[in-house]
Amino acid sequence: MNPEYDYLFKLLLIGDSGVGKSCLLLRFADDSYLDSYISTIGVDFKIRTVEQDGKTIKLQIWDTAGQERFRTITSSYYRGAHGIIVTYDVTDLESFNNVKQWLNEIDRYASENVNKLLVGNKNDLTSQKVVSTETAKAFADELGIPFLETSAKNATNVEEAFMAMTAAIKTRMASQPAGGAKPPTVQIRGQPVNQQSGCCSS
C-alpha cells in the first residue's frame, strides 16, 4: 500500500467535443476556468487527491478528446477505468442524443462494473438550454445511472459530481471480496490495442 494514499482511482471524462470536459477538469483539479480553451488533442490528465470518510483517495482524471477521429486512441483508455463521467452540453441537443453512443463505447471497452455518471454541463446558460433537466433525469433513471447538471464556469456541482463518483467507486470497491483487487477488467474483444496509429503523421 502506498503511504501517500489509500486508493487510486482512474476516472474518464467522455462526451462530444465542445461540451466542456476540459473545463470541468480544470475547475475540479485547479479551481480555474478559461473562456477560450483549446480543443484537447488526444488525451490529457490531471491528478487531485481528496479525503473521504477518513481515506485519502488519489484521483487520476483523464480528459479524452471528443472528436470521432480520436476514437481509436481513446478506446484503450477505457480499460482500467474505475469511473466514467459521460458529459453533454445542455445547450446542444445533438451532444445529448450522442450520449447513447458514448454509453455503447463504455459497454464495449470498459470493465463491466465500471461506475457511470451522466453530467449536463453549461447549466449557467439558462436562456440557451435545450435539454430539460426532466428529460435528462428520466433518461438517466431509465439506465439506472446517477445524473447531475453542472457549470464549470460558475463551479456549480463540479465538486459534487467528482466526489459523488469517488464515493460510489469506494463503496463498490469496499463491497468486493478481498481477492477482487484485480477484477477481470480486461476483456478485449476485437483486435489488440497496440496497433500503431499514425495520428501525428497526417
From Swiss-Prot:
Entry's family note: Belongs to the small GTPase superfamily. Rab family.
Cellular component terms (Gene Ontology): Golgi apparatus; Golgi membrane; plasma membrane; plastid
Listed Gene3D superfamilies: P-loop containing nucleotide triphosphate hydrolases
Intracellular or extracellular location(s): Golgi apparatus, trans-Golgi network membrane; Golgi apparatus membrane
Keyword annotations from UniProtKB, A to Z: ER-Golgi transport, Golgi apparatus, GTP-binding, Lipoprotein, Membrane, Nucleotide-binding, Prenylation, Protein transport, Transport
Membrane topology, as annotated: Lipid-anchor
Polar residues bias spans: 192-202
Protein name from the UniProt record: Ras-related protein RABD2b
